[in-house]
Amino acid sequence: IVAKLLIYLIDFITNVSFYGSFSFSDASPAHNSLGLWVIIVPAVGGLIVGVLAFYGSKAIRGHGIPEAMEQILTNQSKIKPSITFLKPISSAISIGTGGPFGAEGPIIATGGALGSTLGQVMKITPNERKILLAAGATAGMSAIFGAPVAAILLAIELLLFEFSPRSFIPVALACITGSAGHHFFFGEGVVFPMKADVESASNAALFFYSTMGIVVGVLAVATTKIVYWIEDSFEKLPVHWAWWPAIGGVVVGIVGYFEPRTLGVGYNNITDLLSGSLTLQVVVSLCVLKFISWAVSLGSGTSGGTLAPLLTI
């Protein structure tokens, strides 16, 4: 239910911000006709996120998963109940005004906050509260993508730090329920459709895929270092941190003016890439510009998920 409400809110803000329409229908910022005014929209969204973080909770900044891990490791899995509504609202504003993020990080953070809050109300042990936090977080991911197995693996690797029946069973049940919710609210279709007649890979193709995996692994390390460098650069600015998301939003708007496909969630970009309908020039442009927009915006400390943009890149 929370996942569906978040998607509705993102679509509503996207329609209002880029098309002046009070509608909850599916919308992408890529088809806007705002011209140079498109630079202002993400900046205004970033400004609102900064205000929410300043007056609400600084914990809404970031993409959700590291923040959940931090609470598990340092705060006995206790997350402020206010994050339950502040995180999805701030993320919807960020994404709906053109932020190059996905909805998976915010829903993971929101589900984790719901589980943690329930655990605090029930007065259970820290370990049981950790399981509830992980169950809520991964149920959220399963609800967005309809991929319970991937969500369970995420919980084991990033949130539970263990593989035992006492934690695996409740998390698995939560993920299955989240997946059922996905099919109920979003339909039976897959999130990213592909051609059914994919040919078997040749030996040369398998070698290329292996090489590509190594290259992407190296680039992943470089990406992490670049984002950290951008975060450090923002910390050196002579302005309060609440202004950083607005500054990052200006960069997002400038990039979005030249390549509108970089704006918003961009699930349609992944679908187009899988179908092979984009030219090489568009693919290279999207990869480079989406990375610049995402890295600067994330480094500015705004709110949004990273999985969808990284899948695109």
Task: Name the predicted role of every residue range.
Residues I1-I313:
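Alpha-helical transmembrane segments and immediately membrane-proximal extracytoplasmic
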